[in-house]
Amino acid sequence: MNTIFNINPNKKHIEYYIYADDLAVIVKGEDYRSAVRIANFELRKLNNWAKGHSFSFSAHKTKAMLFFRKTVPLRLPLFLNGEKLEWETEIKYLGAIIDNKLKWKPHLDYIYKKCLGTIFQMQKIVGATWGTSPKVMNMIYNCIVKPALLYGSVAWIKCLNKVTYLRKLQKIQSQACRLILGVQKSTPIAAIEVILNLRPLHLEA
């Protein structure tokens, strides 16, 4: 896959991002039409490169997204190997859900539900007088829930300036903290975080 960078030595309008067998192509243009024109030209070159390396790109697994400040009423077609690509408003790439407005709300909603599900599973292995010890529960949170909660935060960190998003993600950590120590909901979360040596999420992200 590394030889794919040789396709276009002039990277003024094109950027490639490769991880294992996942490829993302970023195309920049002076306007919408020029960007689509450049993208179609690049897709043809990628397809020719693939054929020359006994390789193929799957058109039905390839998605397109437009990042544009204004609303575009007509989406010009993009083609890969003669097949028309679908325009999407959200794309999941390497575990992160990217939306075309770069608001990150779909991604934050996704990780909230994912981490909340893990918290529910943690509730099944602990009780008031039985179950996993607080030390192990704390380890589960720090090794499983917290990394998932903060995944990709370098990209969406600015969203935490919005109280709604911060409150939503902090709710996960608050639930986990109370579950780990087995305390009531009325217990101040700041005190619990100090006991568990956890920082508030807006300082962690």
Predicted features along the sequence, with ranges:
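Active-site palm subdomain of RNA-directed nucleic acid polymerases
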Residues: 1-26
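Hydrophobic packing residues in well-ordered alpha-helices of helical domains and bundles
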Residues: 16, 36-39, 43, 57, ...
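Catalytic palm subdomain of template-directed nucleic-acid polymerases
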Residues: 23-48, 69, 103, 160
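Residue-level recognition of alpha-helical structural elements
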Residues: 32-35, 104, 130-137, 158-165, ...
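Short, conserved micro-motifs composed of acidic
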Residues: 41, 56-89
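Basic, alpha-helical interaction scaffolds
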Residues: 83-156
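Short linear motifs embedded in intrinsically disordered, charge-biased segments
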Residues: 134, 161-205
